[in-house]
Design a protein with these regions (language model features):
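Residues in short coils/turns that link rungs of repeat/solenoid architectures in beta-rich domains
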Residues: 110, 156, 161, 192, ...
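Acidic, glycine- and Ser/Thr-rich low-complexity intrinsically disordered tracts
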Residues: 38-55, 118-127, 429-437, 442-527
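Beta-propeller domains
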Residues: 251-254, 258, 267-402
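Beta-solenoid repeat scaffold
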Residues: 48-51, 55, 73-82, 87-128, ...
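N-terminal secretory signal peptides that target proteins for export/translocation
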Residues: 1-16
Length: 527
C-alpha cells in the first residue's frame, strides 16, 4: 500500500518502480543524474476496532481499576463508569493467553463510532484516568500486551503542578525482547491542565502501539528550555501508528528521538502518521514562557510514512520556524541514530514560517550519527507565510545526505522576508542522488540558493553529486541561472491557478503547466 501511495498522484495504480524510472529519465543536467532510491516502506498493522465478546468486568466510581486490570483475562472487557475518576498510577500487567483486554466507557455507544475523531465535547461520556503529581496515569511492565483503551479521558489530576508523561509505554528497555506491545488508544481525550507543567501526552515506546481517532492537547511547560510533546517515542522497534488524531503541543507536537535509544535495534522504526491535524495555537507566539519549535520532528526514525495530514501554524520562536524537521541527533550514547526511509506525501501545511529542514548528519562538533538517506517529499501543498518573522525558507538541506526526492509540491510563499528561498543549501559535505522535479513555488527572494555560491546551477554543482533539476515552476527568478527545462513566469497570474485568492492552488484548464511534468502530470501537487 505504501509504495502505491508514494508513486500516486492522479493515478494511484502507478508503481514506485515507474516513479523511479520517470525521475531517472528527467532532463539531463551538467552533472550526470542518477535515479534517487525511494524510501523502504514501513511495516504496517491493522488497529481497527473489533467489538469484544468476552466477560465484562464493571468498575464503578470508588472501585479499584488496578484490581480489574489484575483480574481481567485476555478477551475480557473492563467497563469504567462514565464520569467517574480513577487516579493512578496504574500498571498494565503481562497476561498469559491470547486476545485483547478492552478498557471502555460505560457510555461508549454515546461516543462517535470507530473511525471518527473525538473532541473535548465528548468528555462527559468518558471516565477519567488521572495522573497524580509527578507520576503517570498508566504505565507498562516488561511485555505488557494487548490492551485497548476506548473512549477514555487521560490527564493529570486537578491541582497537580507537574507531570512528565500522562501515559508511559516502555521501561527504558535495552532489548526488543522486553518491549510492551499491542497497546491501542482509540477515541481517547488526552490532555494537560491549564495551570500545570505537563510535558508529554503519550510515550509510545512499545511495539504495535497505536493512537487513533483521539484528541491530544494542552502539553506545555512554563520554562523556555523544556520541550513538550503530545506524542513521543525514542526507544522502540515499532511498528507505531498515529492515525486521525488532533495533536497539539507547545514545542514539538510529535517527535521521534530526542533521547538516546538503548540499542541500535531500538531506533524508532515503521511509523505510520496518517490523516491527523497538527495544530499550534497562535497564542503561543506572545508567550515568553514556552519553548515553541515545530509540528513534527524526526531525530531518530526509520521507515516512516507521513500522509494526508494537516499541519497548521508554526512560527519562528524558539527555533527558526520550520514546520517539519528530519535532522538526526545523537546525545552521545547512540552513534546508530539515523533518519532514513521517510516519505512525506500528500499533506497540507497551513501558515508555517518555513517548510522542511533536512540534515544528512548531526551538526559538526556534536556526536556522530548515521547518514540520512532515502527521503521523499511529494505532492504536498505548503503555505509558507514567514509566521512571526521567519525567513520563509521552503526547504533547507544541510550536512550532506543521500537519495532525496523532492517532487510535485506546491509552495505558496507569501513570506515578507527579504531572504526567502525555494531552498537553502549549507554543507561541508555534498548531497548525492538529488532529484528536484515538478515543484511549483510562487515567490522567493533568492530562489534555489547555495550558501556562498549563489542560486540555480551554481548551487547544484557546488553542493550536490548526481542531481536532477527539471520541470519546476519558480516565479520571478532568472532563467539563465538555472538548468534548462524549468519555467520562470513573472507572476501568479501567469500560472493560472483555479482560484489563487481562494486558496485553490490546482492548475486551471489552459495553464501552460498542465501535463507539463516529467511524468506528464500537472506541475505542482496532484492530490
Amino acid at each position: 500500500m505504501l509504495h502505491s501511495m508514494l508513486s500516486a498522484s492522479r493515478a494511484p495504480q502507478r508503481s514506485a518502480v515507474r516513479l523511479c524510472a520517470v525521475l531517472a529519465a528527467a532532463a539531463v543536467t551538467p552533472v550526470a543524474a542518477l535515479a534517487a532510491a525511494l524510501p523502504a516502506p514501513p511495516q504496517t498493522f491493522d488497529s481497527s476496532y473489533v467489538a469484544p465478546r468476552g466477560a465484562i468486568l464493571r468498575v464503578a466510581a470508588g472501585q479499584s481499576l488496578q484490581a480489574a486490570l489484575n483480574n481481567a483475562r485476555l478477551g475480557d472487557t473492563i467497563v469504567l463508569q462514565a464520569g467517574a475518576t480513577f487516579t493512578g498510577p496504574f500498571k498494565l500487567p503481562n497476561k498469559p493467553g491470547t486476545g485483547w483486554i478492552y478498557v471502555v466507557s460505560s457510555r461508549l455507544s454515546y461516543l462517535p463510532p470507530p473511525g471518527t475523531r473525538v473532541s473535548p465535547a465528548n468528555a462527559a461520556n468518558m471516565p477519567k484516568i488521572l495522573a497524580p503529581n509527578g507520576l503517570n496515569a498508566l504505565t507498562t511492565v516488561a511485555n505488557s500486551h494487548h490492551f485497548r483503551f476506548v473512549g477514555i479521558e487521560l490527564a493529570p489530576a486537578p491541582g497537580t503542578t507537574l507531570n512528565y508523561e500522562v501515559v508511559a509505554i516502555g521501561n527504558f528497555d535495552t532489548s526488543p525482547a522486553t518491549l510492551a506491545h499491542h497497546i491501542v488508544f482509540d477515541r481517547c481525550y488526552v490532555h494537560g491542565n491549564p495551570n500545570s507543567n505537563d510535558r508529554r501526552g503519550i510515550e509510545m515506546d512499545g511495539a504495535y502501539v497505536a493512537v487513533v481517532d483521539s484528541y491530544i492537547n494542552g502539553f506545555q511547560w512554563a520554562d523556555p528550555v523544556v520541550d513538550t510533546q503530545g506524542l513521543w517515542a525514542f526507544n522502540t522497534t515499532g511498528p507505531l501508528q498515529i492515525r486521525n488524531n488532533y495533536i497539539e503541543a507547545a514545542t514539538e507536537n510529535v517527535m521521534f528521538g530526542g533521547a538516546d535509544s538503548r540499542a541500535a535495534a531500538l531506533v524508532p522504526t515503521s511509523i505510520e502518521i496518517r490523516n491527523n491535524h497538527f495544530f499550534k495555537p497562535l497564542s503561543l507566539i506572545s508567550s515568553t514562557n514556552y519553548a515553541v519549535k515545530n509540528l513534527l520532528e524526526f531525530k531518530a526514525a526509520r521507515r516512516v510514512w507521513v500522509a494526508g495530514n494537516i499541519f497548521e501554524n508554526n512560527p519562528l520562536k524558539s527555533q527558526t520556524g520550520f514546520a517539519l524537521l528530519i535532522t538526526p541527533r545523537n546525545g552521545g550514547r547512540a552513534p546508530w541514530s539515523v533518519t532514513s526511509d521517510i516519505a512525506i506525501v500528500g499533506n497540507t501545511f497551513i501558515n508555517v514560517g518555513s517548510g522542511f529542514n533536512v540534515a544528512g548528519f548531526n551538526d559538526p562538533g556534536y556526536p556522530s550519527t548515521l547518514m540520512t538517506q532515502r527521503i521523499l517529499i511529494r505532492n504536498n501543498v505548503v503555505g509558507v507565510t514567514g509566521l512571526n518573522g521567519a525567513d520563509g525558507r521552503e526547504f533547507q538541506f544541510i550536512n550532506g545526505g543521500s537519495d532525496y526526492i523532492i517532487d510535485h509540491n506546491t509552495i505558496n510563499n507569501t513570506a515578507l522576508s527579504r531572504i526567502s528561498t525555494v531552498a537553502v543549501v549549507e554543507s561541508t559535505r555534498k548531497i548525492s542522488n538529488f532529484v528536484f522535479t515538478n515543484n511549483l513555488s510562487t515567490h522567493s527572494a533568492y530562489g534555489f540558493f547555495g550558501s556562498g555560491v549563489g542560486e540555480g546551477t551554481r548551487a547544484l554543482n557546488a553542493y550536490f553529486t548526481y542531481w536532477t533539476f527539471s520541470r519546476n515552476v519558480i516565479l520571478g527568478r532568472p532563467a539563465a541561472s538555472y538548468p534548462g527545462g524549468n519555467f520562470f513566469p513573472a507572476n501568479v497570474a501567469a500560472v493560472r491557478f483555479v482560484n489563487y485568492s481562494g486558496g485553490n492552488y490546482a492548475l486551471a484548464a489552459g495553464s501552460p503547466y498542465n501535463n507539463a511534468g516529467t511524468d506528464g502530470m500537472d506541475i505542482g501537487a496532484n492530490p
